[in-house]
């Protein structure tokens, strides 16, 4: 069963979508975080939520400000509002399903970037949790320039940049400055599975490999032929299988994935 609602907390209005297991109270909660220009109805989120529903798991997804069904405007999109949205959703999930014994995170691209920026506060709330990062935008400033189709910073300072897919966002240089001064390349001391396409047109593969080396508890699975959106036949099924196995294993055996 899927349920929609909007969380209101201070200056935040956060559309959420919950996927409930059909026959169980659910002992596991999965927080799903979409990418830049995407939304909570992502095909990856939907497929993994459906699969994990067979394994006693509640999934909760949400829209960042200025994304999807969010009533917030592009001028309200910032790293601060994105991180606070994620943390608010986590607080809501923990209060809604107090019986949960385990927490997991699925985060794609920009969503992975925001998750890593907020990792310390997430640990404070959920303890050690299992995390799957799909095509993480570790240096989001570089990804943003590719999405904006410009490397002319001077031009960006003069005007606003239109980004997005189904919903367009008009963003100023101030947002890019936030991205420039915040990158997620650090040792986060967390077990994590990184799913990365080797033909990704947005992510610098050298950044991903360096991040894997820096994070000794991480595991990188490189998907041959996959682009950033993993939209070739069979790739979605592969992601679902790998994520499910990672979430369900009692102990994270990295050697099985390397």
Each predicted region: which residue ranges?
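Catalytic nucleophile-loop/oxyanion-hole region of alpha/beta-hydrolase
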Residues: 67-97
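Short beta-strand element of the alpha/beta-hydrolase
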Residues: 26-35
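The alpha/beta-hydrolase serine catalytic core
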Residues: 104, 113, 125-214, 218-222, ...
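The serine-hydrolase catalytic nucleophile loop
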Residues: 37-49, 206
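Conserved alpha/beta-hydrolase
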Residues: 45, 49-71
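N-terminal cap/lid segment of alpha/beta-hydrolase-fold proteins
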Residues: 1-25
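Glycine-rich nucleophile elbow surrounding the catalytic serine of serine-hydrolase chemistry
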Residues: 107-117
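Alpha/beta-hydrolase fold nucleophile elbow
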Residues: 97-109
């Amino acid at each position: 069963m899927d349920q929609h609602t909007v969380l209101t907390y201070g200056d935040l209005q956060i559309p959420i979508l919950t996927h409930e297991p059909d026959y169980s109270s659910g002992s596991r909660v999965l927080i799903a975080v979409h990418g830049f220009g995407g939304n909570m109805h992502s095909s990856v989120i939907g497929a993994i939520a459906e699969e994990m529903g067979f394994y006693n798991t509640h999934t909760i997804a949400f829209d960042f400000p200025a994304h999807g069904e969010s009533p917030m405007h592009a001028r309200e999109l910032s790293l601060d509002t994105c991180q606070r949205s994620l943390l608010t959703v986590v607080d809501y999930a923990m209060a809604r399903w107090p019986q949960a014994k385990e927490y997991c995170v699925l985060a794609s691209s920009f969503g992975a970037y925001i998750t890593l920026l907020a990792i310390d506060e997430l640990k404070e709330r959920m303890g050690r949790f299992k995390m799957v990062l799909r095509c993480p935008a570790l240096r989001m400033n570089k990804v943003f320039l590719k999405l904006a189709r410009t490397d002319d910073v001077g031009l960006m300072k003069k005007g606003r940049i239109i980004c997005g897919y189904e919903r367009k966002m008009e963003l100023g240089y101030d947002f890019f400055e936030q991205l420039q001064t915040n990158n997620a390349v650090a040792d986060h001391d967390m077990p994590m599975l990184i799913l990365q396409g080797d033909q990704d047109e947005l992510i610098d593969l050298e950044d991903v490999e360096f991040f894997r080396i820096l994070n000794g508890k991480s595991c990188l699975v490189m998907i041959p032929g996959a682009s950033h959106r993993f939209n070739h036949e069979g790739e979605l099924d592969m992601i679902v299988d790998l994520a499910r196995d990672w979430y369900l294993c009692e102990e994270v055996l990295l050697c099985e994935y390397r």
